[in-house]
Amino acid sequence: MVVPSEAEAWRDSIVQPIPYAVSPAFSELRQLVKQAGADDERQWQESLSRAIEAVAGLTAVDGATLMTSAYDVLAFGAKITRRRGHPPIEQMTVTEPVEGDTASIINPTTFGGTRHLSAAQFVHDQRDAVALVAGQDGRFTVFAWSSCSDMVHAHRVETLLL
């Protein structure tokens, strides 16, 4: 899950207490991005690869990994819940980057498994967030709020990864 930097509302959509809150936030990725184009490109690339591998390792823990749009890791192993006072997600738009594909509006319970449904609910409740889900079925989906359709937009991108 990617949430805006400095935002705190995302906490309303996460079961508390968070089992693996990162405090202070892991900021190595953010710092490395700021150093892009540094004098020693090879060393920078190696440092960036190590930082990415460290964050990728956190995704192996059951639950969501949360980071800011500035690349600070806030938590991992987080359990997503519906935000208090907000309705459950009932429909969303689904698209694929395939020529001739048209958007479909579906019930999110029919799309993927628990990870996909949790991500869709998170974005439904936290409209400034983006969720990236790699499902066990091989699907890779990006969830974001669409102000045009006023609903969650799930964009299946696994065909781009082939």
State what each model feature region is:
Residues 1-162:
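Divalent-cation
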